[in-house]
Amino acid sequence: MKNIKLVIEYDGTNYSGWQRQYNAITIQQRLEEAIEKATGEFSPVIGSSRTDAGVHARGFVCNFFTASKIPTSNIKMVLNTLLPEDIAVLDSKEVDSSFHSRYFTTGKEYSYTIVTGDRPPVIGRQYVYYFRRKLDIEKIKNSCEYFIGTHDFSAFKKKGSTARSSIRTIKELTVLKEKNIIKFNIVGDGFLYNMVRIIIGTLLEVGLGRFSIEYVKYILESKDRAKAGKPVPAKGLCLEKVFY
């Protein structure tokens, strides 16, 4: 039995997230269907994250076990011939049987892209959040520092989150503006349900002048979800990389 590690990318627009569901189409389902067609066996796929509906990925990691005699070097090619055009395998390799794509992670990197201007984009609109109002980027940048480090992020998780602990460590949070495109990058040891989207939504409130820079610190310390901003739409979010 071989343990195969995959790195995949996907456009999450038409999917109800990563995790298999009974009444919806998901990335995990499509990948497991392709593996079953290729190997003749059903192999549950273990994902490194549970991305939400509409979220994209450029470097999602997963693994599955198989007794198939397909050479490991050919798995990438075979699966790509069977997967829909909005999912692709970037790399495949055999790893130690102990490897678990979720439990072995040491961190993840996400990006979030916003487009400003007098009209929403047409090309690529499914990958960005159009935001018409003017933002103070310097205030947003200055607010980012409050998120860096180890904190209780209870104020930045969706109600109903089943995480045992709300303590997470953010190693990097940057914002870059080029013309009418604003891109956030965030690196951390792990993220709570909707955490990245709520953080970005809170930073937009700072950029609009509704929240002061210092208020961000207060939100963190309050651990109160009601005090933070609304989550931004899923379509601007992309899982860039998973660290091991």
UniProtKB/Swiss-Prot annotation:
Keywords: Isomerase, tRNA processing. InterPro entries: PsdUridine_synth_cat_dom_sf (IPR020103), PsdUridine_synth_TruA (IPR001406), PsdUridine_synth_TruA_a/b_dom (IPR020097), PsdUridine_synth_TruA_C (IPR020095), TruA/RsuA/RluB/E/F_N (IPR020094). It is an enzyme of class 5 (isomerase). The active site is at 52 (nucleophile). Substrate binds at residue 110. It comes from the Bacteria. Formation of pseudouridine at positions 38, 39 and 40 in the anticodon stem and loop of transfer RNAs. This is tRNA pseudouridine synthase A.
